[in-house]
């Protein structure tokens, strides 16, 4: 330092002067030079003192700069939401202890372009030379930035810019989603309504679908907004939209549940969502236009009076089958094995209002049974396999206009033969687990009644023109011309496929020629034939399950039935031989038969 330097110079000068003095014996000029040197040194010292460079001041000057760099500050930077936090932090953005403390995983947004170099938290820390603490789940979305003042200010600007950019992108994304047809939120338009659709707990996930695909599809198809119930709330879907769209959405939900569950909804008091204050729409009759039993997926028929207060799905329960249409002992189509009067009274609620044709069902425990409901304009046919058919109805052929010659005009009786009276015909169908077929029974009327025509087209004609009488389609054997062979029996043999029938409803396999009975039949024979039909159906079902052999020849397959008793235990050849006898009668019930018909299973 200058002070020590000048001290050394003074010591060296004094030593030099002493040396010069010691050698001054030879000359006397040494003292003058020493004084000049001292003056020069003193002048230099004065100059240094004027500049202020002493030892203490120099030390403080050099120590001030490091002390200024060590001054840090901390600032809190809030963002709008935790989604902004996730976007700014990025995937695995937190490092070490800080990333673990946040407690939630961050997924990147693929559509978000980088707003700045270093938008993620690690790059932002490196760029701004600051420490940024990310918020913990459950806390306020606030970043804590620590560092120098200018670095903290830069980090703050970066975080706020990233948050604003993410807000703009999210707003534009929601706008595009709304324009593309998705439902962004509950609408507030006038005329819209909100209904609640209650479903069983176990089918909520079925309605929502995988990742919400099913409920989204229903929303888009019906143009409604549907709020899905949470796990801890009641299983009620809130549907908002125009009234007709809301009804469509409810029907879509119901149809989806019925289609996926087979329509089997166990109705208990704890889980009775039909009568729980919410209109779900699983009503069998759909208001005032119910179409009778088995009409959940068929078109409603206004001619049938609905029966309120029933739980429709209880009639489709079955212990061994999960498909709609499997009739158990509790069925609308008939009673149990005994066919009690209670079942008949239940059926009377759904029978067509026509005395000419009615159908009853003989249910055998858990056997599948197909019930048919014929009306003037529609025939509702359940699905053969018991599965849900959305449109199982068909339009039969129209009735022939008056004056048109009938197919079997050659068998018309004379007008003096008596007026035609309605005949109550019953169709009982039985089924086994291996094969399902139908046995048809046509018992006659009273002793004084003349059998009417059972052809579907003529029935329609009679209902449209009640004042006209319908002639017979086929006479009994003792009245037919040419007693050698019955005309209709020959027709069955020559036309097995039924292609020459007059009406398309029969060509579809729903029926064959349905002739009347001879006028000589008595009420006793008709009652015995109808009473034996139940046992014969059961026995025939067991026989078909075992061997399916003819009960006469035990060789050919059972494909024919006798009319009117309906026993389907014979092959076509044996049935024809029975009809060709002089006094044809059924070998089982000993009832007089008129013809044999082929059965199409």
Swiss-Prot record:
Matching entries from InterPro entries are given as: KH-I_MEX3_rpt1 (IPR047228), KH-I_MEX3_rpt2 (IPR047226), KH_dom (IPR004087), KH_dom_type_1 (IPR004088), KH_dom_type_1_sf (IPR036612), MEX3 (IPR047227), Znf_RING (IPR001841), Znf_RING/FYVE/PHD (IPR013083)
Cystine links in this protein are none
UniProt lists compositionally biased (Gly residues) regions at: 13-33
Q: Name one GO cellular component term.
A: nucleus
User: Domain KH: where?
Assistant: 98-159, 192-253
Question: Which positions does the record annotate as the modified residue Phosphoserine?
Answer: 4, 320, 494
Positions of RING-type zinc fingers: 550-590
| Subcellular location, record wording | Cytoplasm; Nucleus; Cytoplasm, P-body; Cytoplasmic granule
Q: Which GO MF term does the entry hold, naming one?
A: GTPase activating protein binding
Region Disordered: list its residue ranges.
Answer: 1-39, 90-109, 284-332, 344-448, 514-546
* Keyword Zinc-finger appears in the UniProt entry: yes
- The residue ranges flagged as biased composition, category Low complexity, are 320-331, 362-371, 420-442, 519-540
Q: What role is this protein assigned?
A: RNA-binding protein. May be involved in post-transcriptional regulatory mechanisms.
Q: What is known of its domains?
A: Binds RNA through its KH domains.
Q: Per its record, how is this protein called by name? A: RNA-binding protein MEX3B
């Amino acid at each position: 330092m200058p002070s020590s330097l000048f001290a050394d110079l003074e010591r060296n000068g004094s030593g030099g002067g002493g040396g010069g003095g010691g050698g001054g014996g030879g000359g006397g000029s040494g003292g003058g030079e020493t004084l000049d040197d001292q003056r020069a040194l003193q002048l230099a010292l004065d100059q240094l003192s004027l500049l202020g460079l002493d030892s203490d001041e120099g030390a403080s000057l050099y120590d001030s700069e490091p002390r200024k760099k060590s001054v840090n500050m901390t600032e809190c930077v809030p963002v709008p939401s935790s989604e902004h936090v996730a976007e700014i932090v990025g995937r695995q953005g937190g490092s070490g202890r800080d990333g673990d403390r946040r407690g939630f995983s961050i997924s990147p947004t693929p559509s978000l372009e980088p707003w700045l170099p270093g938008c993620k938290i690690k790059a932002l820390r490196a760029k701004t030379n600051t420490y940024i603490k990310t918020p913990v789940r459950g806390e306020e979305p606030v970043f804590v930035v620590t560092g120098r003042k200018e670095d903290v200010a830069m980090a703050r600007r970066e975080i706020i810019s990233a948050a604003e950019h993410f807000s703009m992108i999210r707003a534009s994304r929601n706008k595009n989603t709304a324009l593309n047809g998705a439902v962004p939120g509950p609408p507030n338009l006038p005329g819209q309504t909100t209904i609640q659709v209650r479903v069983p707990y176990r089918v909520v996930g079925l309605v929502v679908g995988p990742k919400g695909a099913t409920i989204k599809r229903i929303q888009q198809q019906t143009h409604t907004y549907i709020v899905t119930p949470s796990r801890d709330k009641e299983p009620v879907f809130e549907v908002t939209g125009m009234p007709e769209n809301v009804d469509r959405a409810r029907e879509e939900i119901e149809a989806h549940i019925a289609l996926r569950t087979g329509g089997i909804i166990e109705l208990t008091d704890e889980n009775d969502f039909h009568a729980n204050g919410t209109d779900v729409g699983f009503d069998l009759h759909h208001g005032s236009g119910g179409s009778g039993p088995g009409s959940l997926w068929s078109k409603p028929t206004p001619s049938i009076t609905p029966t309120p207060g029933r739980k429709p799905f209880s009639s489709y329960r079955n212990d061994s089958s999960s498909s709609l249409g499997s009739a158990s002992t509790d069925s609308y189509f008939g009673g149990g094995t005994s066919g009690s009067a209670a079942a008949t009274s239940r059926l009377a609620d759904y029978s067509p209002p026509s005395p000419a044709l009615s159908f009853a069902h003989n249910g055998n425990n858990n056997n599948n049974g197909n019930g048919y409901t014929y009306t003037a304009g529609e025939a509702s046919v359940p699905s053969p396999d018991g599965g849900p058919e959305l449109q199982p109805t068909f339009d039969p052929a129209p009735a022939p206009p008056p004056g048109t010659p009938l197919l079997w005009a050659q068998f018309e009786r004379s007008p003096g033969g008596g007026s035609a009276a309605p005949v109550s015909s019953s169709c009982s169908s039985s089924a086994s687990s291996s094969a399902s077929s139908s046995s048809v029974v046509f018992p006659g009327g009273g002793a004084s009644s003349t059998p009417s025509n059972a052809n579907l087209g003529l029935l329609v004609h009679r209902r449209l023109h009640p004042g006209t009488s319908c002639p017979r389609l086929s006479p009994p054997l003792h009245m037919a011309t040419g007693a050698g062979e019955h005309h209709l029996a020959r027709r069955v043999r020559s036309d097995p496929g039924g292609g020459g029938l007059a009406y398309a409803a029969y060509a579809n396999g729903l029926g064959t020629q349905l002739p009347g009975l001879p006028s000589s039949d008595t009420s006793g024979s008709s009652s015995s034939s109808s009473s034996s039909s139940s046992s014969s159906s059961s026995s025939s079902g067991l026989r078909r399950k075992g061997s399916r052999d003819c009960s006469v020849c035990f060789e050919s397959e059972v494909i024919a039935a006798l009319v009117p008793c309906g026993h389907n235990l014979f092959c076509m050849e044996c049935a024809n031989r029975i009809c060709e006898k002089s006094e044809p009668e059924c070998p089982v019930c000993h009832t007089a038969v008129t013809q044999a018909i082929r059965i199409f299973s």
